[in-house]
Amino acid sequence: MGKTQPLPILITGGGRRIGLALAWHFINQKQPVIVSYRTHYPAIDGLINAGAQCIQADFSTNDGVMAFADEVLKSTHGLRAILHNASAWMAEKPGAPLADVLACMMQIHVNTPYLLNHALERLLRGHGHAASDIIHFTDYVVERGSDKHIAYAASKAALDNMTRSFARKLAPEVKVNSIAPSLILFNEHDDAEYRQQALNKSLMKTAPGEKEVIDLVDYLLTSCFVTGRSFPLDGGRHLR
């Protein structure tokens, strides 16, 4: 008899940075992946050529979220995990209507994972005890707050709370946890002064890169016991 094909891992926002690194990590492990992307970066073509299923999605509306869910439901009979990595970053600033800023942040960080978790629940169930996972990517600011990104921080805090609610709802078949990173890697355009200021905010004074996230994701996927928890990746920043 042939070997059973592993169930795919769904990664939202998989076209760049941490989402892209996670997608390649699983591909290199011969783990099928489904990736959502908003903008067709060149990296998407690389994922497709490597065998990933890449679905363009517009999470700015609930209809867009549900259209993406329908595509996933049509493409697979089950999921190994959902990694909610899709994110947006908006600040309260002159000219930006405050209600629009809040609505945008809540849409991507709360409505989207909320709707997808419900819509795809049946794909996660039925595979055994602690056999499936949901991982929410939140943020360090959930703990501290942010005077410049109030809506962003509030939306990530709501996602953090949903981690515990969905853990209660889906146990013991599905484990639900969150990862709360601070600085993981820089953008290419970040100058030396900014980089040093950012590094000085943590005790470890380094940007560890995607591998730190990948290692934690691997731990959560292999655990058969951990659920309903948030895991900070902040280099001791809370102690500064």
From Swiss-Prot:
The keyword Oxidoreductase applies. InterPro entries: NAD(P)-bd_dom_sf, Sc_DH/Rdtase_CS, SDR_fam. Optimum pH is 4.7. Keywords: NADP, One-carbon metabolism, Oxidoreductase. GO terms for biological process: 10-formyltetrahydrofolate biosynthetic process; folic acid biosynthetic process; one-carbon metabolic process; protein homotetramerization; pteridine-containing compound biosynthetic process. This is Dihydromonapterin reductase. GO terms for molecular function: dihydrofolate reductase activity; dihydromonapterin reductase activity; identical protein binding. Catalyzes the reduction of dihydromonapterin to tetrahydromonapterin. Also has lower activity with dihydrofolate. PROSITE patterns: ADH_SHORT. The keyword Oxidoreductase applies. It comes from Escherichia coli (strain K12). Pfam families: adh_short_C2. It comes from the Bacteria. Inhibited by methotrexate. The gene is folM. Disulfide bonds: none annotated. Belongs to the short-chain dehydrogenases/reductases (SDR) family. FolM subfamily. The active site is at Y152 (proton acceptor). It catalyses: (6S)-5,6,7,8-tetrahydrofolate + NADP(+) = 7,8-dihydrofolate + NADPH + H(+); 7,8-dihydromonapterin + NADPH + H(+) = 5,6,7,8-tetrahydromonapterin + NADP(+). Its EC number is 1.5.1.50, 1.5.1.3.
